[in-house]
């Protein structure tokens, strides 16, 4: 099984010149990005070249187990970063530290942790349908417009989620959730925890929701009054 950048490596990498390694990086990157890419002049203290992009980066739909190798790491991506539908991916280590728009790691069925995810995402973060994910630990501390962890059937807790979302937050169809402990404290848009078949408590729900609040079709037969006890919701409440 191949790692993401295996095509850049050989058994005698240490003997290659900086120019040779950079040329191989550039050749590979032609298929993954748009916009302007910058490669550091020299490797960092860990021996890796630092690569940034002003545009989008996509490694989706690939048979990869890791986003890292001994050649280079992403630092900042100005657009979107896609690593969704990589069913063998087990870690987000090596992902950019910052992403200007959206970060997608949806439907990565072997992903068990969000450790290594960007610290800051300007647009939004989506890990929809990651069936082996049990925790949100390692999720971005800032996810500007939205955060989606819906369809993560093994997710047992929302601990690790950003505590403030300007837009929407969705954890619907997370079949192992029993409470909302760890959810953001403030959601500017819509909050969805509907169709969570094990959810029996609204404890931990956001204190403020600027849009709608959905908690229908859960194990607990919640009422509008139940929601109002735990959250100040400006929009429609659907139980």
Q: Where are the regions a protein language model picked out?
A:
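Charge-dense, intrinsically disordered terminal/linker segments
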Residues: 1-48, 53-56, 226
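LRR N-terminal entry segment and analogous cap-like coil->beta motifs
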Residues: 31-101, 105, 144-145, 165-167
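Extracellular beta-strand solenoid repeats
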Residues: 58, 82, 93, 104, ...
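Extracellular beta-strand solenoids
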Residues: 51-53, 59, 76-77, 83, ...
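Leucine-rich solenoid repeat scaffolds
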Residues: 201-239
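Conserved "Asn-ladder"/turn position within leucine-rich repeats
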Residues: 62, 86, 108-109, 130-131, ...
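Canonical leucine-rich repeat
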Residues: 67-70, 89-95, 111-117, 133-139, ...
């Amino acid at each position: 099984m191949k790692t993401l950048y295996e095509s850049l490596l050989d058994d005698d990498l240490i003997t290659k010149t900086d120019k040779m390694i950079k040329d191989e990086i550039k050749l590979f990157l032609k298929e993954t990005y748009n916009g302007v890419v910058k490669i550091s002049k020299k490797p960092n203290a860990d021996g890796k070249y630092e690569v940034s992009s002003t545009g989008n980066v996509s490694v989706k739909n690939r048979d990869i187990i890791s986003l890292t190798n001994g050649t280079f790491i992403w630092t900042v991506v100005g657009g979107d970063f896609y690593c969704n539908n990589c069913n063998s991916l087990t870690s987000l280590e090596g992902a950019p530290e910052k992403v200007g728009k959206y970060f997608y790691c949806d439907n990565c069925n072997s992903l068990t942790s969000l450790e290594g995810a960007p610290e800051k995402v300007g647009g939004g973060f989506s890990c929809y349908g990651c069936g082996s994910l049990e925790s949100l630990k390692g999720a971005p501390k800032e996810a500007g417009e939205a955060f989606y962890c819906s369809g993560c059937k093994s997710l047992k807790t929302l601990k690790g989620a950003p505590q403030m979302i300007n837009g929407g937050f969705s954890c619907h169809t997370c079949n192992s959730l029993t409470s909302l402990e760890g959810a953001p404290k403030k959601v500017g848009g819509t909050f969805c925890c509907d169709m969570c078949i094990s959810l029996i408590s609204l404890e931990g729900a956001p204190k403020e929701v600027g849009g709608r609040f959905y908690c229908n079709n859960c194990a607990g037969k919640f009422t509008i009054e139940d929601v109002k006890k735990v959250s100040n919701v400006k929009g429609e409440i659907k139980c």
